C-alpha cells in the first residue's frame, strides 16, 4: 500500500472561517510490508498465553475442589474414629466393671457370685470416663434406661431399626420442619433422606436438629473462667439457701464437691421459688430488657469487658432478690484489703472451693452471673411444669416405650420382677408438690452430670428449648389471634447453624447464629415465667405442636425434645 506526502493548500482560496488542511494521497514510493512468519509467531504466542492462563485457572479450581473433598473425607474419618474410640471406652469401662465385681464378690462354694446392687443416683458418684454407659430414669412408672452420651441421641438410634415395618413420627412441628428443610435451596444433601418426604423424619436430620437443641446453652468461648450454666445456677441457688439460713450456714459446711452441690439443688430451688412468691421483688423474668441492639448481638459483655453495663439486670426478679438479700456484694466491698471482703462473698467462696481459683467472683466477672440467672429461670420452668403431675396412663397418650422398644421391654420386665426393681409392679402415679422434680433430679440430672460434668441446661432438657422458642414466637399475640405461620422463618436460625456446621464453616456466622438461638431461648423462658399460668401456656403449645397430651408425654418431651410414635411407612 502506497501513500504520498503532504499537500499544502493556499488559505487565500478558502472561505474565511476555514483553515489550511493536510491531505494525503496514494504514492508508489511509500509501502508497508507484513511478514507472514511474524503473524504466525504472534498467533502462536497468543494461543500459548491463553492456554497457560486457562490451565492455571483450571488448576486453581481443581485444588479448591480437592481441598473441599479432602476436608469432607477427613471429617468422616474423624467422626468414625471418634465412634470407635467411644466404643472402645465403653468396652474398657465395662471390663473394668466386671473386674471390680469379681474382686468385690468372689464366688464361693461353687455358686455364682451374687449380682451387685444397681447404683442409686441419690448416692455419691464419681465421674465416668469417656462415653461410658449409665442408667437414667425419667418416670417412676418405667424401668431405667441405659444410655451413652445423651438420652435423646441414644434413644434416636433405637427408633430406626425396623423401618420396613414402621417408622417414627414426631408430630406436627417436626413434620413442618422437615418439609421446610426439603424445600430450601441451600441445605446439606446428606440430610435429605427418603423419610423426610413421608410422615417421618430421617435419622440424620433428627440427629442434627436434636444436637443443635442440646447445644443451645453450651459455652462456645472456651474460657477457663466460664462455668457451665447448670453449675453457675447451682452455686447461686445454694449460696442463697445458705445465706437465708441466717447464722446456720456458718455451722453448716459449704459444699466441697459437685456431688454435694447437686444434692442441695432441689432444696435451694424451692427456697428461691418460695421467696419470689413471698417477697415479690420488682422486675420480670427477662435476662435482657435493654433496647440496645448491640447488647443483643453478643452474650458476653461488649468491648471485651468483664462486666455488663450498669443496670443490665436491674429488671430481673431473681437478680433483685439476690441483691436484696446481700448475696451479690459490690465490687467496692470485694476490693477491701485483706480477706474479709472476699469472705463476705458466699458465691465466690463456694465457686473457689469446688472449681478452684480460675473462677473469679461473679460480681466482677459477670458471664457466670448471667448464665446462672438464665439457667435458674429454666430450672424454675421445669419445676413448675413438674410441680404436680399424674402419670396414670391416659387414652390419648402418645409415647409408649413398649411400642418403640418392644423386645427390650419384654425382656426387661421379668428380670426387674425377679430383682424387685421399680417399674415391674404398680408404682405411684400421683405426685405431690415438687416430688416428681426431685425424682428427675436424682435419677436423671445427677447421673447425667456424673457422666458429663460439662452438661448444660439445654443438653439435659432439649424439649425445654423448643418450648421456649415457640413461646417466644407467640409473645404479644392474644390466644384468639394465633395465626398459622406459612413462612417457615422460625426454622431459619436452626437451619443456619446446621448449614454453617456442614457446608460453610464460617466461625463468625456460626457465632452469630448460636447467639441468636440462645437469646431467643432466654427470652422464651422469661415469657413463659411471666405468664399468669406457665403450665397452661406450655400445655397448649406441647399439645398443638408436639402432640403431648398428658403429664407423662410432657415429662418425656422435656428430656428428649421429641415424642415418637410408630406409624406405617408410606
UniProtKB/Swiss-Prot annotation:
Determine if Cell inner membrane is one of this entry's keywords.
no
GO biological process terms on file: symbiont entry into host cell; viral genome packaging; viral penetration into host nucleus
Keywords, in A-Z order: Capsid protein, Host nucleus, Host-virus interaction, Viral genome packaging, Viral penetration into host nucleus, Viral release from host cell, Virion, Virus entry into host cell
Q: Region Disordered: which residues? A: 102-123
InterPro entries named in the record: Herpes_UL25
From the Swiss-Prot or TrEMBL record, state where the protein is found.
Answer: Virion; Host nucleus
- List the residue ranges of the region (Interaction with major capsid protein/MCP): 1-54
Keyword flag Transmembrane helix:
no
What task does this protein carry out?
Capsid vertex-specific component that plays a role during viral DNA encapsidation, assuring correct genome cleavage and presumably stabilizing capsids that contain full-length viral genomes. Participates in the interaction between the capsid and the tegument through interaction with the large tegument protein/LTP.
Q: How does it assemble?
A: Heterodimerizes with CVC1. Interacts with major capsid protein/MCP and triplex capsid protein 1/TRX1 at the pentamer vertices. Interacts with the large tegument protein/LTP.
UniProt-recorded name of the protein:
Capsid vertex component 2
From which organism does this entry originate? Epstein-Barr virus (strain B95-8) (HHV-4)
Amino acid at each position: 500500500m502506497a501513500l504520498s506526502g503532504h499537500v499544502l493548500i493556499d488559505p487565500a482560496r478558502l472561505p474565511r472561517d476555514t483553515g489550511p488542511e493536510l491531505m494525503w494521497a496514494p504514492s508508489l514510493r511509500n509501502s508497508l510490508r507484513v511478514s507472514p512468519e511474524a503473524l504466525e509467531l504472534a498467533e502462536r504466542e497468543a494461543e500459548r498465553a491463553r492456554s497457560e492462563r486457562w490451565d492455571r485457572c483450571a488448576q486453581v479450581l481443581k485444588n479448591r475442589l480437592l481441598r473441599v473433598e479432602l476436608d469432607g473425607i477427613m471429617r468422616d474419618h474423624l467422626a468414625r474414629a471418634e465412634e470407635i474410640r467411644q466404643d472402645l471406652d465403653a468396652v474398657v469401662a465395662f471390663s473394668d466393671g466386671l473386674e471390680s465385681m469379681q474382686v468385690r464378690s468372689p464366688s464361693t462354694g461353687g455358686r455364682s457370685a451374687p449380682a451387685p446392687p444397681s447404683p442409686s443416683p441419690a448416692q455419691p458418684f464419681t465421674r465416668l470416663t469417656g462415653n461410658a454407659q449409665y442408667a437414667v430414669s425419667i418416670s417412676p412408672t418405667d424401668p431405667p434406661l441405659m444410655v451413652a452420651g445423651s438420652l435423646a441421641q441414644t434413644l434416636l438410634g433405637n427408633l430406626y431399626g425396623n423401618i420396613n415395618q414402621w417408622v417414627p413420627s414426631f408430630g406436627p412441628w417436626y413434620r413442618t420442619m422437615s418439609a421446610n428443610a426439603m424445600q430450601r435451596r441451600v441445605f446439606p444433601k446428606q440430610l435429605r433422606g427418603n423419610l423426610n418426604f413421608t410422615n417421618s423424619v430421617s435419622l440424620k436430620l433428627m440427629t442434627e436438629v436434636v444436637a443443635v437443641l442440646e447445644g443451645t446453652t453450651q459455652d462456645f468461648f472456651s474460657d477457663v473462667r466460664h462455668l457451665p450454666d447448670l453449675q453457675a445456677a447451682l452455686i447461686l441457688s445454694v449460696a442463697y439457701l445458705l445465706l437465708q439460713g441466717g447464722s446456720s450456714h456458718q455451722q453448716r459446711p459449704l459444699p466441697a464437691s459437685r456431688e454435694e452441690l447437686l444434692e442441695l439443688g432441689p432444696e435451694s430451688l424451692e427456697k428461691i421459688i418460695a421467696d419470689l412468691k413471698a417477697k415479690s421483688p420488682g422486675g420480670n423474668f427477662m435476662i435482657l430488657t435493654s433496647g440496645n441492639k448491640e447488647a443483643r448481638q453478643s452474650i458476653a459483655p461488649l468491648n471485651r469487658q468483664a462486666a455488663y453495663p450498669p443496670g443490665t439486670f436491674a429488671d430481673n426478679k431473681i437478680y433483685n432478690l439476690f441483691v436484696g438479700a446481700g448475696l451479690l456484694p459490690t465490687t467496692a466491698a470485694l476490693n477491701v484489703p485483706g480477706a474479709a471482703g472476699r469472705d463476705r462473698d458466699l458465691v465466690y467462696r463456694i465457686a473457689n472451693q469446688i472449681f478452684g481459683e480460675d473462677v473469679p467472683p461473679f460480681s466482677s466477672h459477670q458471664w457466670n452471673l448471667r448464665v446462672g440467672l438464665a439457667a435458674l429461670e429454666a430450672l424454675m420452668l421445669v419445676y413448675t411444669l413438674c410441680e404436680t403431675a399424674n402419670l396414670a396412663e391416659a387414652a390419648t397418650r402418645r409415647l409408649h416405650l413398649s411400642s418403640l422398644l418392644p423386645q427390650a421391654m419384654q425382656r426387661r420386665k421379668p428380670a426387674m420382677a425377679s430383682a424387685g426393681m421399680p417399674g415391674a409392679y404398680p408404682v405411684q402415679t400421683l405426685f405431690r408438690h415438687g416430688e416428681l422434680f426431685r425424682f428427675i433430679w436424682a435419677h436423671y440430672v445427677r447421673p447425667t452430670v456424673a457422666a458429663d460434668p460439662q452438661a448444660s441446661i439445654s443438653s439435659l432438657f432439649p424439649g425445654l428449648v423448643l418450648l421456649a422458642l415457640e413461646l417466644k414466637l407467640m409473645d404479644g399475640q392474644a390466644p384468639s389471634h394465633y395465626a398459622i405461620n406459612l413462612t417457615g422463618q422460625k426454622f431459619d436460625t436452626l437451619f443456619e447453624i446446621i448449614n454453617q456446621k456442614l457446608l460453610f464453616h464460617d466461625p463468625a456466622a456460626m457465632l452469630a447464629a448460636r447467639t441468636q438461638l440462645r437469646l431467643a431461648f432466654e427470652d422464651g423462658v422469661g415469657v413463659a415465667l411471666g405468664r399468669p399460668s406457665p403450665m397452661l401456656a406450655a400445655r397448649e403449645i406441647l399439645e398443638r405442636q408436639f402432640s403431648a397430651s398428658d403429664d407423662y408425654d410432657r415429662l418425656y418431651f422435656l428430656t428428649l425434645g421429641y415424642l415418637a410414635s410408630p406409624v406405617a411407612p408410606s
